[in-house]
C-alpha cells in the first residue's frame, strides 16, 4: 500500500494508472483486431473501479465485472473521465504525492451518486439484483441507493470504446501474456480481496472465457435450466481472496442475445439461486 490513502490507493492501483495507456491501447487494438466503433480509444485514462470500496460491508456487496467501459459523447463524460483524471495524473507524476489522485478516486467512489453515471446501464444492474437480494435498500425503486451500498464495478478491459466488440477467445489468450491486462487483473484481485463480495457477477458473454481461465481455474459450469440461450449462465468459485467466493456469469443485460426480457432476467437469477443453494 502507498501514501495516506492506505485503504484506497493500493500499489495495484498505482501500477495500473502509471502505465502508458496510449501504448497499451494501440497494442491491444492490434492484438484483438478491433476496428470501427469497437476500437479502444487512447485518450481516456483506464477505468479502474467505481463504487465506494471503503464503505462496502464484507459479504453484503457484489462485485460486478463488465466487458469494457462505454465511450460517451458528452461534456459531463469529458470532465469526469478525461479532464479530471488527466489533471490528477499530471500532478501525481510531477509531485510523486499520491494525494494528488484524491479528487479522481473520490469521484470514482461517489460515481453512483454523480451526474456522470451511465444511468441507463446501471439501472438495469440495480433492478436485476436489488429487489431480490437487497430489498430493504432497494424498496420501491431506490436503484441508486442499492448501487451505492452494495455494488462495486470493474471492467475486464479497462479502456473505452463506442461499442463492445471484443472476441472472448482472443481476449482470454491475450490475458495470458499482455502486461497491461495482467496489471489490471492484479487490480481486480485487489478489489476482490478488499471488499470480500457475497459473489462476483460478470455481465457479458465476451468475458466468460477470460474469467473462467483467470478466476475459476478453468472450472466454470454452464447451466441452461430454462432452455433459453438468453438466460444461460456459467457458474463457479474463485479463491483469489483467500475465501471461496461464488461467481455468476451471464450474458449482457440489454444486449443482443442477452437476458433482455423480465422473464429471461428472472430465469438467470432463478438458475443462480438454485445453484447457489447447493454450492454456497
Which residue ranges define each predicted feature?
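Surface-exposed cleft-lining segments at the edges of enzyme active sites
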Residues: 101-121, 125, 158-182
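Short, solvent-exposed loop/turn segments at secondary-structure junctions
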Residues: 68-72, 157-161, 205-209, 252-257
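A contiguous catalytic/ligand-binding core that recognizes phosphate-bearing ligands
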Residues: 130, 134-147
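Structural motif
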Residues: 64, 201, 247-249
